[in-house]
Amino acid sequence: MNFKYIVAVSFLIASAYARSVQNDEQSLSQRDVLEEESLREIRGIGGKILSGLKTALKGAAKELASTYLHRKRTAEEHEVMKRLEAVMRDLDSLDYPEEASERETRGFNQDEIANLFTKKEKRILGPVLSLVGNALGGLIKKIG
């Protein structure tokens, strides 16, 4: 009798443990899915913000280029224009990321590709903002 009781209790404990492990796995997988969805949403929002920022910077650079286009430029202004043109090419290259697609086909994971884009955007946006700030500062000084 005691042996049957011990076996029955052991079976109940084992089945309860198996159910709890299964429930834990399900809740973890549900959390993983929710985390992945929220990360996708955050990346989507970040992408939209960066896209808007790129568009604004392109517009500002084009406006600066058009103001410098129809008058004589100093050597410094000519250098600024060359830098703006280079920045515009770099911003356009963000829209067509050939490097990333090549890396993806070679087996890089998505995190490495996202880090590559983040580094590239930081490398481009820093000089763009300083160039636009310097050009606008120069225009304000000339106007004022």
Swiss-Prot record:
Where does it mainly reside?
secreted
Keyword Signal appears in the UniProt entry: yes
Source organism, top-level taxon: Eukaryota
GO CC annotation, single = extracellular region
Tell me the keywords, alphabetical order: Amidation, Amphibian defense peptide, Antibiotic, Antimicrobial, Cleavage on pair of basic residues, Cytolysis, Fungicide, Hemolysis, Secreted, Signal
Subcellular location(s) of the protein:
Secreted
User: Isoleucine amide occurs at which residues?
Assistant: 143
Q: Name one GO biological process term.
A: defense response to fungus
**Expression (tissue specificity):** Expressed by the skin glands.
Signal peptide residues are: 1-18
Annotated propeptide span(s) = 19-43, 73-122
Entries under Pfam families matching the protein: Bombinin
**What is stated as this protein's family in its record?**
Belongs to the bombinin family.
Protein role:
Maximin-3 shows antibacterial activity against both Gram-positive and Gram-negative bacteria. It also shows antimicrobial activity against the fungus C.albicans, but not against A.flavus nor P.uticale. It has little hemolytic activity. It possess a significant cytotoxicity against tumor cell lines. It possess a significant anti-HIV activity. It shows high spermicidal activity.
Q: What is this protein called?
A: Maximins 3/H16
Q: What is the lineage of its organism?
A: Eukaryota, Metazoa, Chordata, Craniata, Vertebrata
